[in-house]
């Protein structure tokens, strides 16, 4: 049986919120089979638990934001991406602010945290959402699409007319049957343009943003002294985001995802469109792990490896 997974022990870290600039304490705790990934605002007078789900995503303008009973947890996509990449099904995420800390702007810190805690298989079958029919959403020239596929692969195209981005490649296709999430995707950082950062700060946003947690570009070049971690880091980060956005559906997808200029809002709209058509998907499990797609028949250290 291909089993559900959680972490072995509690692990904690401290970082800053990308937009608030405030210190955030983050605690990851093991969770029982069938729990899913549950975020908890432990700083509130009465803590609020917000299970990750497609229907709980509210604001998507700058990040994926979970909302419930007036409580928010923002910028969940990098942590969710790490959970997807490591095959974590069940987890409690305690936070002391309304933002998940940005860390270094990628998913690498969350991968390290989860691996430090250890990964534990649980005596319950891992559940997948198998896409049975194509589903697509569009917004002008932007689109995101899911097609039936026995595994998980993504094709993402960006279109930033910028000399530094043009040189790195604007399209990427990855099949996790033969690609390691940890090695090839997790370290890709978020990016932004210097003039946009200044505008956002005037609006009280991006107060925690710096070249320690983002790739920053001016009109012509990358400003970070250390350059890029991957030759195609820009499109890889958009793929990292998409993996996290899609994982809020509650289970790993067995599907092919194709996107052009998609973002958090369109990714969430795609999940809602999928869930609105009961004939477009089914929940499946695998009694024999070897019968699962090769990207998911992993050991307890890595997924998509």
From Swiss-Prot:
The keyword Transferase belongs to this UniProt entry's keyword annotation: no
Entry keyword 4Fe-4S: no
Instruction: Identify the keywords attached in UniProt to this record, alphabetized.
Output: Hydrolase, Lipid A biosynthesis, Lipid biosynthesis, Lipid metabolism, Metal-binding, Zinc
GO terms for molecular function, please? metal ion binding; UDP-3-O-acyl-N-acetylglucosamine deacetylase activity
Positions that bind Zn(2+): 78, 237, 241
Q: Please name the Pfam families in this protein's record.
A: LpxC (PF03331)
Mind listing the GO biological process terms from this record?
lipid A biosynthetic process
- Catalytic activity line of the entry: a UDP-3-O-[(3R)-3-hydroxyacyl]-N-acetyl-alpha-D-glucosamine + H2O = a UDP-3-O-[(3R)-3-hydroxyacyl]-alpha-D-glucosamine + acetate
Name one cellular component (GO) term.
Answer: membrane
- EC number(s) from the headed UniProt entry: 3.5.1.108
Q: Which domain of life is it from?
A: Bacteria
Q: In which pathway does it act?
A: Glycolipid biosynthesis; lipid IV(A) biosynthesis; lipid IV(A) from (3R)-3-hydroxytetradecanoyl-[acyl-carrier-protein] and UDP-N-acetyl-alpha-D-glucosamine: step 2/6
Catalytic residues of the enzyme: 264
The cofactor named in the record is: Zn(2+)
Q: Which residues form a coiled coil?
A: none
* Family of the protein in this entry: Belongs to the LpxC family.
Kindly give the HAMAP family that the UniProt entry links to this protein: LpxC (MF_00388)
* Described purpose of this protein according to its UniProt entry: Catalyzes the hydrolysis of UDP-3-O-myristoyl-N-acetylglucosamine to form UDP-3-O-myristoylglucosamine and acetate, the committed step in lipid A biosynthesis.
Q: What is the name of the protein in this document?
A: UDP-3-O-acyl-N-acetylglucosamine deacetylase
């Amino acid at each position: 049986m291909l089993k559900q997974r959680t972490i072995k022990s509690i692990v904690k870290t401290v970082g800053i919120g990308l937009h608030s600039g405030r210190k955030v304490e983050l605690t990851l705790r093991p969770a029982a089979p069938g729990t899913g990934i549950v975020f908890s605002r432990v700083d509130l007078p009465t803590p609020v638990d917000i299970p990750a789900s497609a229907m709980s995503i509210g604001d998507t303008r700058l990040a994926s934001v979970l909302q419930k009973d007036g409580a928010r947890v923002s910028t969940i996509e990098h942590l969710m991406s790490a959970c997807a990449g490591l095959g974590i099904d069940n987890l409690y995420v305690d936070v002391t602010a309304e933002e998940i800390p940005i860390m270094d702007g990628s998913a690498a810190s969350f991968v390290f945290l989860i691996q430090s805690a250890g990964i534990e298989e649980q005596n319950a079958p891992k559940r997948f959402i198998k896409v049975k029919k194509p589903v697509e959403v569009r917004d002008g020239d932007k689109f995101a699409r899911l097609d039936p596929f026995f595994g998980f692969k993504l094709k993402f195209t960006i279109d930033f007319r910028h000399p530094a981005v043009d040189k790195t490649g604007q399209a990427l296709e990855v099949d996790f049957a033969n690609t390691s999430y940890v090695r090839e995707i997790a370290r890709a950082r978020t990016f932004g343009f210097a003039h946009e950062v200044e505008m956002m700060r005037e609006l009280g946003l991006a107060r925690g943003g710096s070249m320690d947690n983002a790739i920053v570009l001016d009109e012509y070049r990358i400003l970070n002294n250390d350059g890029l971690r991957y030759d195609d880091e820009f499109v890889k980060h958009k793929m990292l985001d998409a993996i996290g956005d899609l994982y809020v559906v509650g289970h790993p997808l067995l599907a092919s995802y194709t996107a052009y200029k998609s973002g958090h809002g369109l990714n969430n709209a795609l999940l809602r469109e999928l869930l609105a058509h009961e004939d477009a998907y089914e929940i499946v499990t695998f009694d024999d792990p070897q019968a699962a797609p090769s990207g998911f028949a992993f050991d307890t250290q890595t997924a998509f490896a």
